[in-house]
């Protein structure tokens, strides 16, 4: 984590002079109006340590308080997901879009509140409710990867009760530019200094139903 974050921080600051970088190990203190890189050098650290092969590198650029540009790279499959607001979403140079599957035929990704087990009971309730009404559950434990997969139609639903800014900053622009819907709950803008709950879906109808379940 430390070596990759140091490498990315150096490259990104050179790419955009004056920008700040935050991640799991960074010390920059951002404020409103800053151009800010939000990075996760190894999203899915436990997967990486155990050689499961599901980890990614995630880089997001936050502009005016919102994720504006995002890159998610999956080295095990040499897959580069990327998007810039207003310019579409891509996977290895090919335009991508969310799937058109309805709720009953959707797959849900959720990591079961890995960071705080106190939230496990409500997570179980929500996941079970969604699982009963959808097609299947996929819990690989790599937030940025799962969100990027939604953008290219591999999954349709995402819910996590507590993740950190660097887990989602890179993937949010990719989902939105691919036609999907994503929302950070209980927040007016993208939080930079605290964890948050997040939901996402491939369609407006699926998003509305998922949010209804989560908010009950």
Stretch-by-stretch model annotation:
Residues 1, 12, 45, 74, ...:
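Residue-level signal for inorganic ion chemistry
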Residues 1-42, 205:
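N-terminal subdomain of lithium-sensitive/metallo-dependent phosphomonoesterases centered on the IMPase/IPPase/PAP
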Residues 2, 25, 41-44, 75, ...:
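Generic detector of well-ordered alpha-helical packing
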Residues 13, 27-29, 72, 97-101, ...:
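Short secondary-structure boundary/capping segments
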Residues 23-25, 93, 141:
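Short loop/edge segments at beta-strand edges and connector loops
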Residues 31-90:
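DPxDG-like acidic metal-binding loop motif
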Residues 62-66, 76, 85-88, 94, ...:
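Short loop segments at secondary-structure junctions
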Residues 98-216:
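An extended, acidic
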């Amino acid at each position: 984590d430390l070596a990759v974050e140091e490498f990315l921080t150096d490259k990104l600051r050179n790419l955009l002079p004056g920008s700040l970088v935050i991640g799991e190990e960074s010390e920059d203190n951002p404020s409103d109006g800053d151009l800010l890189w939000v990075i996760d050098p190894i999203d899915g650290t436990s997967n990486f340590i155990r050689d499961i092969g599901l980890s990614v590198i995630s880089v997001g650029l936050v502009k005016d308080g919102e994720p504006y540009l995002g890159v998610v790279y999956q080295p095990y499959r040499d897959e580069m997901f990327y998007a810039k607001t207003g310019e579409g979403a891509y996977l290895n140079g090919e335009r991508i879009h969310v799937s058109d599957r309805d709720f009953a035929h959707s797959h849900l990704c959720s990591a079961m509140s890995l960071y705080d087990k106190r939230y496990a009971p409500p997570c179980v309730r929500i996941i079970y409710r969604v699982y009963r009404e959808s097609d299947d559950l996929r819990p690989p434990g790599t937030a940025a990867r799962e969100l990027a997969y939604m953008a290219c139609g591999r999954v349709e639903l995402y819910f996590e009760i507590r993740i950190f800014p660097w887990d989602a900053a890179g993937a949010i622009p990719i989902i939105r530019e691919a036609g999907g819907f994503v929302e950070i709950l209980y927040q007016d803008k993208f939080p930079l200094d605290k964890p948050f709950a997040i939901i996402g879906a491939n369609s407006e109808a699926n998003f509305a139903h998922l949010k209804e379940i989560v908010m009950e």
